[in-house]
From Swiss-Prot:
It comes from Rattus norvegicus (Rat). GO terms for molecular function: symporter activity; ubiquitin protein ligase binding. Belongs to the major facilitator (TC 2.A.1) superfamily. Organic cation transporter (TC 2.A.1.19) family. This is Solute carrier family 22 member 18. The lineage of its organism: Eukaryota, Metazoa, Chordata, Craniata, Vertebrata. The gene is Slc67a1. Coiled coil: none annotated. Signal peptide: none annotated. The keyword rRNA-binding does not apply. InterPro entries: MFS, MFS_dom, MFS_trans_sf, Tet-R_TetA/multi-R_MdtG-like.
Amino acid sequence: MSGQLPSSMVALPRQGIIILTYVLAALELTCLFMQFSIIPYLSRTLGLDSVSFGYLQTTFGVLQLLGGPVFGRFADQRGARAALTLSFLAASALYLLLVASCSPALPGVFLLFASRLPAALMHTLPAAQMVITDLTAPTKRPTALSRLGLCFGIGVIFGSLLGGTLSTAYGIQCPAFLAFVVTLLGAVLSFTCIPVTTKEASVQSAHQGGTSVFDLKAISRLLLLPRVLPVFLVKVISGFPSGLFMVMFSIISMDFFQLEAAQAGYLMSFFGILQMMIQGLVIGRLSTRFPEEALLRSSVLVFAVVGLGMALMSNVFHFCLLLPGLVFSLCALNIVTDSMLTKAVSASDTGTMLGLCASVHPLTRTVGPTLGGLLYRSYGVSILGHVQLMVNLLVLLVLWKKPLSQKGDKAR
């Protein structure tokens, strides 16, 4: 990683920029999960029924799905500083509208739906992944990306805890206002401390005077590269069944596991702690000892085993036994595929590639509630396990018959 980075207003060494990026990601994710913890209660307070709440969630997912690739291309062309600053400013706008929707004197339902609009530009995590990808050597990339799991775990645990505690003690608008202040601070830190670009000068010049940020042909060309499409399809197909289960988890925890709200919160905290441990500590070490394709196959295999367990489970204790395997598979699949995909494209396109990767989860959130709800109502929880088992056995068979080649140079 030779070459000089364009200066920021506050000079930081390369390692300092990476650490600050982790901090910014943790702050944004904490605010995001604070929002997730109050949205159901705010919706109920404003009189939304379950159908309207579903529309609200779908709107958020669709906007993030559409915005991810475009934001990634913007990050490649305009640099890390502009991308992170824009993401935090969009988040600030979302939380400000959320605060306004809590006021009885204002049209709350309209403002609540309007607060979803900035979600199209809220992509701090992909921007952070781009910074880390640009500033680390390819051999160290999986370990560096896996440390973002610690940030995610911090967001799940502290965001959910703060959201519930503050809304109970000071009102439902308090977490939203705190998130507004924190994301404004994140925008200031991004603008003053993050370099204009984290790409080297020779790489950044490839985008100067190039095509538009909204050039969908350039985005689709990247996705159709020979070493990109197979890995991306594995990422989408293998993770989709577990995504269906996670989308339906709030319903499953109430109906199937018979959990109270507090008990479901404890289970989510357990999930967050496991994710911190596995993604932050386990995956990084495994990536230094085993090839990425071996880790990818192992994640698909564990997905299949967990799917079998889900098909047979009958209570929450069984699910707790399956949870470490589920979290391992989710973490390994996401980290390994992100690393493989960024290595498969040129350094000038890493942001766009990570933006495409970031669209996978919103895709599940968009399609999942309808499909998952239909399967769950018709066949029960076991069908979600059977789908996960069969899909991942099929993916594993394809990977076994036709391995993903890791040879050759990056796409230029």
